[in-house]
């Protein structure tokens, strides 16, 4: 039903002039893209108001075509669409950096890892690199259960735990100076550093 009515709407300007089913009797020479699209949109909006929002028509063109053509009276422009297809592609370069350094720090002691994070952030900021972090990752707890007694009395036990604290730092758009300053850092021995490029 919807397909046949849609084809009737699209091909109605092409109807023969002696047909009695169409009262307007349009001429084929007066047919233009703008008028047929506006008739189609008007008919669809009158037939079902609930589906009017889903019947948007978008026309896309290559940048060369847009620059070479001027907007004439027969060109169709959709109202209400402020976003451009070209603008979306241009922003994707700014969102995802081409190169980044991801530094993951692990330590059993919080003051050591905080001091190391501060040194890395200062070294990156002095070379004008953009930084993200330090992001505290979840602390991993390894619990060891040991019997107090060497032989019997299994009810009495010691519970030992080792907590591993983690931090994550991203350095976006690093330069050669940034990498040199990071290599010169003297971090404490109790901090495990993992670097990914």
Curated annotation (Swiss-Prot):
* GO BP of this protein: translation
Q: What subcellular locations does the record give? A: Plastid, Chloroplast
A single GO cellular-component term from the record reads: ribosome
- Transit peptide from where to where? 1-60
| Subunit | Part of the 30S ribosomal subunit.
**What protein family is recorded?**
Belongs to the universal ribosomal protein uS10 family.
Name the UniProt record assigns to this protein: Small ribosomal subunit protein uS10c
- Biological source species: Mesembryanthemum crystallinum
